[in-house]
UniProtKB/Swiss-Prot annotation:
Low complexity compositional bias, start-end: 45-57
Lineage: Bacteria, Pseudomonadati, Pseudomonadota, Betaproteobacteria, Burkholderiales
Protein name: Lipase chaperone
One cellular component term from this protein's GO annotations in UniProt: plasma membrane
Region (Disordered): 45-78
Known function: May be involved in the folding of the extracellular lipase during its passage through the periplasm.
InterPro entries: Lipase_chaperone
SUPFAM superfamilies: Lipase chaperone-like
NCBIfam families per record: PRK01294.1-1
Membrane-protein topology: Single-pass membrane protein
Domain of life of the organism encoding this protein: Bacteria
Record's keyword terms, sorted: Cell inner membrane, Cell membrane, Chaperone, Lipid degradation, Lipid metabolism, Membrane, Transmembrane, Transmembrane helix
Organism of provenance: Burkholderia ambifaria (strain ATCC BAA-244 / DSM 16087 / CCUG 44356 / LMG 19182 / AMMD)
A GO BP entry: lipid catabolic process
One MF term in the entry's GO annotations: unfolded protein binding
Length: 344
C-alpha cells in the first residue's frame, strides 16, 4: 500500500464528523461537470432524512432484503430509506435523490440495463406492492433522463471556473434541464443546491467587480447575506465554524502536537464534548488505517496469485467482508481500492 492509499482527507473527516458533525455547505460544486454520486457517504444516510426534508410522519414499510448479487461498490451496505407522505405516496423529498445516488454509486460497474435492474430491485425491497412503488420507478426514469441530458452537454457541462458568464450559463442550463426532465421533482432534488449556487455566483460577481471599491464590495456582500433565509444563514455559520475547526486541527497536527495537547486546545475552542469526539475519531481513524493496511497486503497477495478476474474479484470481495464488518466500511474499502487502482 502506498503512503497515500487508504487515506481519505483525514483532517477534514475528523473535523466534519468529530468536531462539528455537519456536512460542509457546498460551494459552486456544479462546475465540476456531471452530477457526482456519493457512494459510501450516501450508504450511511440515516432513516430520518425524510423528516429532515419535511416529509410527513407516515413511515415507509419495513424494508426487505434486496436480491443477492449486489455490485461490489455497494457490498455490505443498504440503501437509504424512501420516504412516504401521510397518504402513502412517495414523499417529495431530497431523500429520494439520496436513494438514487446510492444506486448510482455502482454505475461504473454496471451496464445501463443492469443499473435499471438494481434500482427496480432496491425499490421493490422497500415498496413492493404499494402505491409508492410505481411512483418511485417514474421518478427514477426522470432522474436518468436528467443525467443523460447533462452528459450530452459540451464537456458534460464542465466550465472554466474563472469565467462568470460561463458559470451563469451552466447554472441556467442545469436548472432548465432539471425542470424539463424532473418537473415538480426538480425543487426537492435540486432547489436548495441551486439556490446556494446562485448565491455563491452572486458573491463571486461582486468580489470580481473592478468598478467597486473594497468598501462597496463589503456593503453589497452584506446586503446579499441579508437575503439569505434564516436556516441557510445558520447552516453557513455552522459551516464557517466547521472550517475554522478543520484549519485548527490541521495546524495542530502540522505542529506535531500530542493527542493530549490537541485535546486541551480543542476543548478551549470547541468545548469538551466536541474535543472528545475529535479524539475518538482520531483513534478510529488510526484503527482504520491499520486494518486497511493489513487488508491491502492480503489483497495484493490475491492479485498476485494468477487467478481469473472473476475468482480474484470474488476473493477480494470476501476478504473485504471478513475484515470490514461495520456498516459502510466495506464500501469505503472498495472505493479506496478503485482509487488506488486508477492511480497505478
Amino acid at each position: 500500500m502506498t503512503a497515500r492509499e487508504g487515506r481519505a482527507p483525514r483532517v477534514r473527516r475528523v473535523a466534519v464528523y468529530g468536531a462539528v458533525g455537519l456536512a460542509a455547505i457546498a460551494g459552486v460544486a456544479i462546475w465540476s461537470g456531471a452530477a457526482s454520486h456519493r457512494g459510501a457517504d450516501t450508504a450511511r444516510l440515516s432513516a430520518d432524512a425524510a423528516a429532515r426534508d419535511g416529509a410527513s410522519a407516515a413511515p415507509p414499510p419495513p424494508a426487505r432484503p434486496a436480491s443477492a448479487g449486489m455490485p461490489s461498490p455497494l457490498a455490505g451496505s443498504s440503501a437509504p430509506r424512501l420516504p412516504l407522505d401521510a397518504a402513502g405516496h412517495l414523499a417529495k423529498s431530497r431523500a429520494v435523490r439520496d436513494f438514487f445516488d446510492y444506486c448510482l454509486s455502482a454505475r461504473s460497474d454496471l451496464s445501463a440495463t443492469a443499473l435499471d435492474a438494481l434500482v427496480v430491485r432496491e425499490i421493490a425491497a422497500q415498496l413492493d406492492g404499494t402505491m409508492a412503488q410505481p411512483e418511485a420507478l417514474d421518478v427514477w426514469h426522470r432522474y436518468r433522463a436528467y443525467l443523460d441530458a447533462l452528459a450530452k452537454l459540451p464537456d458534460a457541462g464542465a466550465v472554466d471556473k474563472s469565467d462568470l458568464g460561463a458559470l451563469q450559463l451552466a447554472l441556467d442550463q442545469r436548472v432548465s434541464i432539471a425542470y424539463r426532465t424532473l418537473g415538480d421533482w426538480s425543487q426537492p432534488f435540486f432547489g436548495a443546491e441551486q439556490w446556494r449556487q446562485r448565491y455563491d455566483l452572486a458573491r463571486l460577481k461582486i468580489a470580481q467587480d473592478r468598478t467597486l471599491t473594497e468598501a462597496q464590495k463589503a456593503e453589497r456582500l452584506a446586503a446579499l447575506a441579508q437575503q439569505m433565509p434564516g436556516d441557510e444563514r445558520a447552516a453557513r455559520q455552522k459551516a464557517d465554524r466547521q472550517q475554522a475547526a478543520i484549519d485548527q486541527i490541521a495546524q495542530l497536527q502540522k505542529s506535531g502536537a500530542t493527542p493530549d495537547a490537541m485535546r486541551a486546545q480543542l476543548t478551549q475552542t470547541l468545548g469538551p464534548d466536541a474535543a472528545a469526539r475529535v479524539a475518538q475519531m482520531q483513534q478510529d481513524d488510526a484503527s482504520w488505517q491499520s486494518r486497511y493496511a493489513d487488508y491491502a497486503a492480503q489483497r495484493a497477495q490475491i492479485e498476485a496469485a494468477g487467478l481469473s478476474p472473476q475468482d480474484r474479484d470474488a476473493q477480494i470481495a470476501a476478504l473485504r467482508q471478513r475484515m470490514f464488518t461495520k456498516p459502510g466500511e466495506a464500501v469505503r474499502a472498495a472505493s479506496l481500492d478503485r482509487g488506488a487502482a486508477a492511480a497505478r
